[in-house]
């Protein structure tokens, strides 16, 4: 991590922890984010090709060049803005990707629907550096299909010059009429409905249809206060002071903080989502060995450290964490303490009838006036 950011963390994190998990220091969205090239099955002259489909703002692109230089394998890289966008592309058969990086709950769904290839870990020896705490997870119990890429927490980001300290601490800030038209809400169904569920005291993973409907009713009440529903658009709006309150991922908050030191972050008292994004290979993907070579490379200490220091997310690699600046590796939001973890809940896979309900309720929210 850049030294300037590490210094800002050391100056501000302590004050945030004193105020109860307050630090002042990717969902159905619009579609693909433009990437470097379209998927292809053509081979380069040197070592073939690997088509990678990842979230926006979620890689140090120089590591792609490093991978090609080391292996001779060309990377065709495209981005998406939500798990649901990625799923729709795969389910529609519209593209041939060799590596995808979905979140935990989406991995569970892809496994259940037989949409992933089992990995050959003989080709991924660097898997040994993955933190044992992140191996054999609930979403992939035997680690047959996935290798952790990054992980982290979701929380509330706010402008410290515009938001009163007495209003902090809860998800309720996103419903505070004082900040009408300065609130940004995340633009995907699982996260937005999940936030409303948590604010009501329910589980992210409830299958109680009445609770889900109640959560969407709460989002409809919030809608007049919302300036915009956003994904990566949140960067420009919060960095530029064009909105004062939003919810996003801690790694992205650290990126925003470099550009606007007036931003703060906290974990709501009701609890939040802890997630893992992992590298997988879609069923029937071309160039599977190239895909496994890419996954193995991303788990190397050199590539992992370079990537982590660029995008700020929490690394699953033990050697990388050891190499980070101590101010970063001891950051309790990047590498949560037990009291913070006690407030966290992972997303689980949901049955199809509940997924259908999410879709219809999300449409109800978006069409509400």
Regions found by a protein language model. Name each.
Residues 338-369:
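Conserved C-terminal helix/tail region of periplasmic/extracytoplasmic solute-binding proteins
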């Amino acid at each position: 991590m850049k030294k300037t950011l590490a210094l800002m963390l050391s100056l501000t994190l302590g004050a945030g922890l004193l105020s109860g998990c307050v630090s002042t220091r990717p969902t159905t969205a619009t579609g693909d984010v433009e990437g470097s090239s379209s998927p292809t099955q053509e081979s380069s002259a040197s070592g073939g090709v690997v088509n990678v489909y990842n979230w926006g703002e979620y890689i140090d692109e120089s590591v792609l060049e490093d991978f090609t230089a080391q292996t001779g394998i060309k990377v065709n890289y495209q981005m998406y803005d939500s798990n649901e966008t990625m799923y729709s592309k795969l389910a529609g058969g519209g593209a041939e990707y060799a590596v995808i990086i979905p979140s935990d709950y989406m991995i569970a769904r892809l496994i259940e629907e037989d949409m992933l290839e089992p990995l050959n870990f003989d080709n991924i020896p660097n898997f040994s550096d993955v933190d044992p705490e992140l191996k054999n997870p609930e979403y992939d119990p035997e680690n047959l299909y996935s290798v952790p890429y990054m992980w982290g927490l979701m929380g509330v980001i706010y402008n410290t010059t515009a938001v009163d300290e007495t209003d902090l601490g809860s998800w309720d800030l996103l419903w505070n009429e004082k900040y009408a038209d300065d609130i940004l809400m995340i633009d995907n169904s699982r996260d937005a409905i999940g936030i409303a569920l948590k604010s009501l005291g329910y589980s992210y993973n409830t299958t109680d249809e009445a609770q889900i409907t109640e959560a969407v009713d709460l989002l409809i009440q919030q809608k007049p206060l919302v300036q915009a529903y956003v994904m990566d658009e949140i960067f420009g709006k919060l960095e530029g002071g064009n909105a004062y309150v939003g919810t996003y991922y801690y790694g992205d908050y650290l990126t925003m903080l470099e550009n606007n030191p007036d931003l703060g972050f906290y974990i709501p008292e009701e609890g939040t989502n802890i997630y893992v994004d992992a590298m997988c290979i879609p069923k029937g993907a071309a160039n599977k060995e190239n895909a496994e070579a890419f996954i193995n490379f991303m788990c190397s200490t050199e590539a992992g450290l370079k990537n982590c220091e660029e995008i700020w997310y929490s690394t699953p690699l033990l050697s990388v964490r050891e190499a980070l600046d101590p101010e970063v590796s001891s950051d309790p939001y990047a590498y949560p303490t037990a009291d913070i973890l006690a407030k966290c809940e992972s997303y689980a896979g949901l049955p199809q009838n509940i997924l259908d309900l999410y879709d219809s309720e999300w449409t109800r929210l978006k069409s509400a006036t």
